[in-house]
Amino acid sequence: FNESDLYESGLLEEVLTEIDDKGLSYKKDGALWFKNTKFGEDKDRVLIKSNGDMTYFATDIAYHVYKFKHYDLLIDIWGADHHDYASRLTTAMKALGYDVKNRLQIHLIQFANLVRGSKSISMSTRSGDFYPIQDLVKEIGSDATKYFYLTKKKEQHLEFDVDLAIEKNKNNPIYYIQYAHARITKIIHNLD
């Protein structure tokens, strides 16, 4: 799904019209605002900036309207830094009449910090600096990737030591587990 689909399909305009028709927006200082405070939020949020540009909030509302119309259960996985944004979006979807309690799950997860040696691998999705998980899997394997990610809860910060994950010795827990599995398998095989 591309954000441009929201514009090209007309869904974004339909959603903005619905928001207006339901009295959920107002104009101020040349911008269009959503009435978040009407639903207990700390402040109202901009949908369309004074220069005419849409905000992420506006397109995210439209995207979630699309998802509510096409899917039974919506699962969003966001970085923990989006905590306030989750509340904002949930409020908007409730205001539009969607069953967020039973159909929308927003999971907030901590970021994984990839480390090589003593240096962190700098990442920023906004600037386009990131290390895709597919590349990590190619480099260290799917077993090691899964293992290291599963050692922490989603709410916990993960320092992912790439060099350790590559090591082929007992310092690397996944290597040790794989080695133990191979030994046990051989013992069982020899019993037959």
Give residue ranges: language-model regions.
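Alpha-helical recognition segments enriched in aromatics with Gly/Pro capping
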Residues: F1-L191
